[in-house]
Regions:
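Acidic, glycine-rich loop-and-beta core segments that form the ion-binding/anion-interacting portion
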Residues: 163-191
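A helix-coil-helix interface module used to build multimeric assemblies
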Residues: 1-149, 153-162, 167
Length: 191
């Protein structure tokens, strides 16, 4: 893709950011819709090159991974904020006495700070699980093509780095065909 084509494609994509689209546009999926709109704005010669060395298979896998990655970052930041608030509150209640319960009955006298720190510990384990999931999700599938890679020489690692991924998924079938990372994410947020 020439610099001129890239500028036209990027300009078209930028102009689409704030547009609203009809759900029933006739496009097979969001990728076809975006490609059609980019071609309308940038022209067929430039816009038609947008998917060079890419397939919908690796793009869909990429989109899902980027969305989950963003969601995990948001959730982890919320967890850290909540943990910080619980620890701060616990510092202010180091001498506050409260009843501790077991089997729906008061069992012992304890400290409110002890209770708060127990909740912080639970949330930290949630954070730790999500962070591990993030590491599994944050691998780029781009360049895997539909299932067997691309014949166009590309630097998958460079693309991955530009998009904020820690690395690439080496096996093209794994990159485009599996969704175990989605199941892992759903399982982690279900806890």
């Amino acid at each position: 893709i020439t610099k001129n084509d890239a500028k036209k494609i990027l300009s078209a994509l930028e102009s689409l950011k704030n547009e609203k689209f009809e759900a029933f546009s006739g496009a097979e999926d969001i990728h076809e819709l975006i490609e059609t709109l980019v071609i309308k704005k940038a022209g067929m010669i430039s816009g038609g090159k947008m998917h060079t060395a890419r397939s919908r298979n690796d793009q869909v896998a990429l989109d899902i991974r980027m969305k989950i990655r963003d969601d995990i970052n948001i959730i982890c930041n919320c967890l850290l904020d909540t943990i910080e608030a619980l620890v701060s509150l616990a510092k202010n209640h180091q001498k506050t006495i409260m009843p501790l319960y077991t089997h729906l009955q008061q069992a012992q006298v304890g400290l409110f700070s002890h209770y708060l720190l127990a909740q912080a510990d639970v949330l930290f384990r949630d954070f730790d699980r999500l962070y591990t999931t993030f590491n599994h999700v944050n691998q780029s599938p781009l360049g895997a093509g539909p299932v067997g890679g691309t014949s166009i020489p590309i630097d998958r690692h460079s693309t991955a780095k530009m998009l904020g991924f820690d690395g690439v998924i080496e096996n093209s079938l794994d990159a485009t065909s599996t969704r175990d990372f989605v199941a892992e994410y759903v399982a982690m947020i279900a806890i």
